[in-house]
Swiss-Prot record:
Binds calcium through the terminal sialic acids. It is found in: Secreted. GO terms for biological process: cell-matrix adhesion. EPDs are synthesized in the meninx and secreted in the cerebrospinal fluid. Forms disulfide-linked dimers. Pfam families: Ependymin. One of its GO terms (molecular function) is calcium ion binding. The gene is epd. Its main location: secreted. This is Ependymin. Glycans are attached at N69, N92, N112. Keywords: Calcium, Disulfide bond, Glycoprotein, Secreted, Signal. GO terms for cellular component: extracellular region; lysosome. Belongs to the ependymin family.
Amino acid sequence: MRLTGLLCVALWSASAVVLAEHQPCRPPPQTHGNLWVTAAKGAPASVGEFNYDSQARKLHFKDDALHVNKTDHLEMLIFFEEGIFYDIDSHNQSCHKKTLQSTYHCLEVPPNATHVTEGYLGSEFIGDQGVRMRKWRKRVPELDGVVTVATTSCGCVTLFATLFTDSNDVLVFNFLDVEMKVKNPLEVFVPPSYCDGVALEEEGDTFFGLFH
């Protein structure tokens, strides 16, 4: 752990010398963990498990029914490259295939985002009590709002993100227990068999809109 920390410090120091300004970093190839999404009123909008492949640009998320008190539990499979997503109901074995209206999401830094700041989340001076992070911001016209993403300085793992819209809606995303792998990679990004042959519906949504 100490060696990893020293390596991160060394890499950060070297990059600070070479680069005159921060460029958006790239996330790890694969990540898996838990995602907590909180809406404007403070109640959890969704809590569940996510798997993300940044190279194939595919995301799977499924609500944890034990943590969220609602009747409709979200399960989605998003193909950002293809611009589609599947709204999945595994309980009733039903599936809707819809258009993804925007490819922006918060599991990686948006292209051309502005670097805001760099510092420690927690404490820099107490061992194992802080994480060095970078914060990025970008206005996204198709979302009518501003997306802010905070990542680790070394590794570019998303820690938390926010969407502030012009209509004063707020979504806060917190990423917990993140691992550098995908759970069941041969299955998690494959639509279930009852999605086969489902027609593409005219109705669409965005990554952020799915959590409203």
